Amino acid sequence: MTQLPSQMADRWQGMLYWHILLGRSPQVRALASMAQDRLAGFSGLHFTPKRWLHVTTLTVGFIEEFTETDIGNMVAHAKRLLNDTPPARVTLGKVLYHPEAIALKVEPAGALDQVREAVRAAATNGEAKQHESWIPHITLAYSTSVQPAEPIIATLGRRLPPYDISVDCVNLVVQEGAERLWNWRSIAKVFLGSSSKRKM
C-alpha cells in the first residue's frame, strides 16, 4: 500500500460463485448441528447458517462484470457439460482444521472433480486456466479471533459419524455484502445427468 489509488472501490460488491448447496440435506444438517453443539462453548467462532452449508466449487468473479446474456450462456454451457455426469456419492465425517476455519472433508478425493471442471469450463468459455489445487469441503465454522486450537480440536475431535450423501446439482450464487452477512441468492441451478428430470 505504497501508492495512492486513483479511485476507491466497493469492498463488498457482489461476487458470483458456483456452490454445491447442501443446506437441505438432513445428513449434512445433522453433522453441522452435532459439530456446532459441541463447539457452542467457544467464543470466536462464526457458524455457517445451516441454510447455506455448501461446497465452494468455483469463484467466478464480480457480478457487475457479467451481463444477463453472459450468465445465461454460462449456465447453458454448464448444463451441456453436466448432462452426462451422474450424481456423485460422497462421504462426510472427517474434520479438517485450518487456522481460519473448521470444515468437513468431502471424500473420496476426486469425486466432485467433474463438477468443478464443468463449471470452470463454463465460466471461462472453454479457455484453459492454470490448474489450482482443490480440496472439497463444507465449512462449519469460521474463526473470528486468536485462540489456542488444541481445546477446540479436543472437543470436536478428528472425525464425526460418517454420512453418505448424493450430490445431484450445483448452484450459481450471488453473494452480496460482507461475507458474514450471508446475503446470498441462488440465480441458477444445474442438475447432474439424469437428476435433471427432477423438479427444481
Model feature map: region roles:
Residues 1-200:
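Histidine-dependent nucleotide/RNA phosphoesterase domain, centered on the 2H-phosphoesterase fold
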